[in-house]
Swiss-Prot record:
Keywords: ATP-binding, Magnesium, Nucleotide-binding, Transferase, tRNA processing. ATP binds at residues 12-19. Belongs to the IPP transferase family. Its EC number is 2.5.1.75. The gene is miaA. It is an enzyme of class 2 (transferase). It comes from the Bacteria. The record marks 103, 125 as: Interaction with substrate tRNA. Substrate binds at residues 14-19. This is tRNA dimethylallyltransferase. It catalyses: adenosine(37) in tRNA + dimethylallyl diphosphate = N(6)-dimethylallyladenosine(37) in tRNA + diphosphate. Residues 37-40, 161-165, 253-258, 286-293 are annotated as: Interaction with substrate tRNA. Monomer. Its cofactor is Mg(2+).
Amino acid sequence: MSSLPPAIFLMGPTAAGKTDLAMALADALPCELISVDSALIYRGMDIGTAKPSRELLARYPHRLIDIRDPAESYSAAEFRADALAAMAKATARGRIPLLVGGTMLYYKALLEGLADMPGADPEVRAAIEAEAQAEGWEALHRQLAEVDPESAARIHPNDPQRLMRALEVYRLGGVSMSDLRRRQSAEKADFDASGRNQLPYTVAQLAIAPEQRQVLHARIAQRFRQMLEQGFIAEVEALHARSDLHAGLPSIRAVGYRQVWDYLDGKLSYAEMTERGIIATRQLAKRQFTWLRSWSHLHWMDSLAGDNLPRALKYLKTVSILA
């Protein structure tokens, strides 16, 4: 076995059954569950994120769930720091960190590290916000196109958070975000096709999804309708009533939430909201599959198979995660 402590990544698209398998693994192994989900971090956003129930969380505690208010932001860099701390604590207790979720950017940040970006600066952000109010975000998008055309091509003018961040990075250091990312790629000596990574762990990577895409689509539609039956609209109404929340926040832009928000604003009918929520979730799953197809060293399992737990345990022994 490797001298490095073990860790397990359990990835997959939304509605694939990751949580159920993670809990089964936690029953079978001395694991500590760590959420890798950019929506589950928010308090008060339970139904639309398919957050495990309070009863399940009491039985299977997850780190990095309910750690932010919906008015707050949370970056991949913050996740990396929090996840590494949670993994270190689990290892110190003699337990295996089991990271489960579908936010692929977070996994990538863990494995490869992040570009050495400057931190957020309140004064610079306030100046950008003032310019946006005076001139509009499209004018700021044109500014970005002059100094960082690659980021401008990637960021929509109606995405103020990412637009502000790209301008902030340039104004703080005089170097574009695109150049910083290229520098990171060139310096990424600790990560290559052989599977080396910047984590001080021996990592086994599992992925779960239905073999047939139409099966996943049916599960997505069924789950979204179940969320509506469980009170999803009332959950978003509580958020909508808060004066400090708006449609531009990362929390409210989460899949499902932005569609219900538009419904509450009178922009969509109930039927349109339902259809668009399902379509948006399917698009999320497609993006997750795109990430996963480019991933190396993944062990895939079929969501519909009845023997995923023994198969996962067998694989973990094969790659020396388990004795």
